[in-house]
A protein has these predicted regions:
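A glycine-rich, hydrophobic/aromatic-adjacent loop/helix-cap motif
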Residues: 1-285
Length: 285
């Protein structure tokens, strides 16, 4: 079974310590990779006696938001241990099925834990420095941003964590649709992502796979307005739709300044192998 962790379970020693104190084996928690939960942001509005302060929760917003964490696989016995640790019997946290983005950009469903409604406080509940550091270290160790943690620590939990968009085709500078993106550009730089680029006649499409696709990384000045317009251009009708031409997802982008997580669009339709662009570049030098 697949599990998405975003709080203290990003720290192996915290998990191992709990298991040892309770006579359980920690070995059934197998980490797969860094991942993102779609449509949720991190929030501190629950006081944990055990943590001596606020404990993390993820709360739903809309599909312009996402929270980083890690994807794990758990065996049946480890699920029982996880339920114990999360206090499901006592009504502290409860499991919830969510949509998760894997490192490749693939979307899957997994379970996570959210705070039970009657344990939620209306005000910001500050976490202890030790608990905050567990999460911060867990994110840093996986190359994930702590922007959402910083927002939550300042009671600005509903701010956007991902403010970048990766484009690789007709939205790039000098291309036919760049004018529709240009009003939303705060900054722009070259970047690349893992994937395979295909020529779909008048525009390209990415599929996940072993390869490198080159493009441009845009920092958006208005995330929701930009993505709303780009969704329309790319034929993305929402994560519940099976009729989208492209799927909006999250991927790591390599730039000369380092790694940056960004939204991008991957093609949903069928492609012929002979349409692959081996150079990974739509705009040739």
């Amino acid at each position: 079974m697949m599990y998405f962790g975003y709080g203290s379970n990003l720290d192996w020693n915290d998990w191992k310590g709990y298991c040892e104190r309770n006579g359980r084996s920690p070995d059934g928690l197998i980490e797969i990779e860094p991942a993102w939960i779609l449509g949720y942001n991190l929030k501190f509005h629950y006081h944990s006696k055990g943590r001596k302060g606020g404990a993390a929760d993820v709360v739903p917003l809309n599909h312009y938001h996402a929270t980083p964490g890690a994807l794990f696989e758990l065996d049946e016995d480890t699920w029982k241990t996880m339920n114990m640790k999360e206090g499901t019997r006592g009504g502290y946290y409860e499991p919830k099925e969510v949509l998760v983005v894997r490192q490749s950009g693939e979307l899957i469903t997994a379970l996570t834990y959210v705070v039970c409604e009657d344990k939620i406080k209306q005000q910001y509940t500050k976490p202890s420095p030790e608990y905050e550091q567990l999460i911060r270290n867990g994110l840093a160790n996986r190359g994930l941003p702590d922007t959402g943690l910083d927002h939550s620590m300042n009671d600005a939990w509903d701010h956007h964590v991902i403010e970048h968009l990766f484009v690789y085709g007709t939205l790039m500078g000098g291309e036919v649709r760049h004018g529709e993106l240009s009003p939303y550009i705060e900054s722009i730089e070259e970047g690349s992502m893992q994937g395979i680029l295909y020529d779909l006649d008048y525009y390209p499409g990415i599929k996940t796979g072993e390869g490198i696709v080159h493009g441009e990384l845009i920092k958006m000045n208005d995330v929701e307005s930009c993505l709303t317009n780009m969704d329309s251009i790319e034929g993305f009708y929402g994560y519940e739709s099976k009729n989208s031409l492209y799927q909006r997802t999250i991927v790591p982008i390599q730039t000369k300044h380092g790694l940056q997580w960004a939204w991008t669009y991957v093609y949903s339709g069928h492609v012929e192998e002979n349409t692959r662009i081996d150079s990974g570049r739509w705009k040739q030098p």
